[in-house]
Amino acid sequence: KTRLCRLPEGTFDFLGYTFGRCYSTQTGKAYLGTRPSKKSIKRLIDSIHEQTERRTLLQEATLIVERLNRTLIGWANYFSLGPVSKAYRSIDAYAKARLRRWLCNKHKASSGAYIRYPDAYLYEHLGLVCLPKRTQGLPWAKV
């Protein structure tokens, strides 16, 4: 498990974070920092996929959204340090797409998921948490 690497050039994963070179969005300068590792993002995506499988179609949409929110908020609270905006946006897009697909399967709607269930419906009516908006204004999250 022990591994040596040169930090400016190489990266290493530890406790779900990838440590290595990051770039400032304002100045473009490189600095040593952290970001969520690909493995931790993949694990969260697998969890979202599992929570929105076809076998859960008999459950209420609010229950599914509560479980998704619990998972997303917990993950976002742990991974709130460093440049997380790219990871938050990709996870948010995946969660919205899976929830739309789940709703279409539940209500037997073959097409028109984005028209039938727009973002406003998912966020305001069902109460899905929006990850990119969670950490706006926090100086350490750099979102």
Task: Kindly label every feature range from the protein language model.
Residues 1-143:
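Non-catalytic terminal/accessory segments
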